Amino acid sequence: MKFSEMPYKRIDMEEVEKEYKSIIERTKNAKSGEEQFEIHREYYKFTADVQTSMELAMIRHDIDTTDEFYEKESDFYDEVGPIISQYENEYGKVLYDSPYRDYLESKIGKVTFKNIEIANKAFDEKIIPLMQEENALSSRYSKLIATAKIPFEGEVYNLSLMRKFQTSPDRELRRKA
C-alpha cells in the first residue's frame, strides 16, 4: 500500500482516554504475569493505531503545510500529544511496579523497564501545558520555514531551493545567497 492510499481518521480522545484507563486498570488488577502480558499486547496494538493516526496527520501536514485540514489536525495533535504521553507514562508506572515484573522482563526484556524508569524520571504532568506550547511553537516554526519565499537573482525560492546557491562553487554567488 502506498502512503497516499493509507486511510486517515482522527483519533477520538474520549475513546482513547477510556481505553488507556481500561488498560491501566486491567493491568493493575491482573492475577498473573501471563494476564498482564496479554494486556500489554493489547496496549501495543492500541498505541500503534493511535500513533499511526498521529504520524499520518503530521507527515501529511509536513508534505503540504498549506493544507488547512492537516494544519488543523497538526494543531489537534500538538494539544493532545502530551496528554497521550501522560497516559503512556501512567501505564508504564503500573507495568514497572508490577508484582509480575520478573515474568514480564522475561517476555518483553529488561530494556523496556529501563526505558520506563527513564521516562518516569523525565515526565511530570505539571509540564503538559509547556509541552503543548512547545509543540505549537515547533509547528509554527516548521510552517514558517516551509513557506518562506526568498527573492534572489530575479526569482523567488524556498529555503531548500536556496541550498544550491549556498553550496555553489562560485564564492560570490554563495556570498549573495
Region spans (language model):
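A well-structured
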Residues: 1-177
